[in-house]
Amino acid sequence: MYYKFSSFTQKLAGAWASEAYTPQGLKPVSTEAPPIIFATPTKLTSSVTAYDYSGKNKVPELQKFFQKADGFHLKRGLPDQMLYRTTMALTLGGTIYCLIALYMASQPRNK
């Protein structure tokens, strides 16, 4: 008699020899070809549908604006200053917190 683990009952159950020697989850590869997934669509659209997002693309204009070599890195004024200062404060605070945590972890407690 051969046994195989039943995923339904979560116990060993009797099985045929061919089932018992086939690992669960691994089955022999089928010889038939799988169906084609990426085929040419049968219905071709005559015009390309374009979505109107919120207007024209502003990326090229912003690239020219931010890549000007005028020696000034905060080009949009107060929002850039606030973002820069917040980022630097969080970075420094996180670094200090990590260093303190490493120091405390490296010092054993006396009991």
Swiss-Prot record:
Q: Transit peptide boundaries, per UniProt?
A: 1-54
Q: Where are the transmembrane segments?
A: 79-104
| Single biological process term from Gene Ontology | mitochondrial electron transport, cytochrome c to oxygen
Keyword Amino-acid biosynthesis belongs to the record: no
One short Pfam family name for this protein?
COX7a
Where is the PTM N6-acetyllysine found along the chain? K68
Q: What does this protein do?
A: Non-functional protein. In contrast to the protein found in other strains (AC Q99KD6), cannot induce the assembly of mitochondrial respiratory supercomplexes.
List cellular component terms (GO).
Answer: mitochondrial inner membrane; mitochondrion; nucleolus; respiratory chain complex IV
What does the UniProt entry say about where the protein is found?
A: Mitochondrion inner membrane
Quote the Gene3D superfamilies the UniProt record gives: Cytochrome c oxidase, subunit VIIa
Q: What is this protein called?
A: Cytochrome c oxidase subunit 7A2-like, mitochondrial
Family, per entry: Belongs to the cytochrome c oxidase VIIa family.
Q: What induces it?
A: By estrogen and silica. Expression is induced by ATF4 downstream of the EIF2AK3/PERK-mediated unfolded protein response, thereby increasing formation of respiratory chain supercomplexes.
What's the source species for this entry? Mus musculus
Q: How does it sit in the membrane?
A: Single-pass membrane protein
Lineage: superkingdom: Eukaryota
Supply the alphabetized keyword list: Acetylation, Membrane, Mitochondrion, Mitochondrion inner membrane, Transit peptide, Transmembrane, Transmembrane helix
